[in-house]
Amino acid sequence: MAKTNISVILPVHELNEVTKPMFQNAIQSVTDQTVQPDELIIVVPKGSETAKYIKDFDFGANKKLVVIAENDGATDFSSQVNYGVSVAKTEWFSILEFDDEYAKIWFKNVVDYRDAHTNVDLFLPIVIDVDSVGNFIGFTNEAVWANSFSDELGILDNNALLTYQNFNIDGMVIRKSTYDEFGGFKPSMKLTFIYEFLLRMTFKDVRVMVIPRFGYKHVNQRPGSLFSNYKETLDPVEAKWWLSTAKKEYYFPKDRQITYESQN
């Protein structure tokens, strides 16, 4: 079977009886790909019960792809992804959340578009958003295919991002060297790390294309998730502060460890 030169980075900070079936579905969505990734890197907290569960998990057809990366550092999403990228051996990588799923032909579409658009370093899917029980909520990333949204149809640019923030990097496929060169995710950006990352990439003239195909199913703000729990503690003033901070921090390639408390 053809390979893609892509590693899947799958961060897992904790699993429970609700999320274990979701994790199984996420793994199955990798198995079902018509074109397979080269690696499935599962990042877990070192020495944790989650690490033990993952080590004992039956990966079936994916077994030869699996790399279990035990991280003894921070367990937030950004830090886990950054750690996974550091051990990846492929030219490209993709991000899969443990409660989400790829569409079956996502990597085939990536390979086809990558071959046709050799100057693009970051590909995004059109994301189907669902709630925690699978009910449809809406789509994300499709806006770049609307006329006059950005300077070039299908390409996300910095000017468009400064006026419209609703984009998702889940499922993205990015050249590893580009991610490393421009700093990766910034853990301190908490609420707006996705937005800041895309602003930074486009500011650095990284070409970001949304492939006009449904490529990823995302569970939006699942109760109990790290992001959902964090948002519940926010007031509108802090939420607005994170948005404005992202628009300032994207000029800096490295995380400056900014916190809301230290700036207010």
Name each model-derived stretch.
Residues N25-P37:
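Short, acidic, metal-binding catalytic loop of nucleotide-sugar glycosyltransferases
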Residues N71-A88:
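Glycine-rich, basic loop-to-helix element that forms the pyrophosphate-binding segment
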Residues F93:
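Short aromatic/hydrophobic "clamp" motif used to bind/position activated sugar donors
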Residues F107-F139:
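Conserved donor NDP-sugar-binding/catalytic core segment of glycosyltransferases
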Residues I126, M209-G215:
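Catalytic beta-strand/loop signature of glycosyltransferases that borders the donor
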Residues E142-Y164:
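Short, flexible, basic/aromatic active-site loop/helix in glycosyltransferases
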Residues K190-F197:
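Acidic donor-binding loop at a coil-to-helix junction in glycosyltransferase catalytic cores
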Residues F214-Q221, F227-T259:
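Catalytic core of nucleotide-sugar-dependent glycosyltransferases
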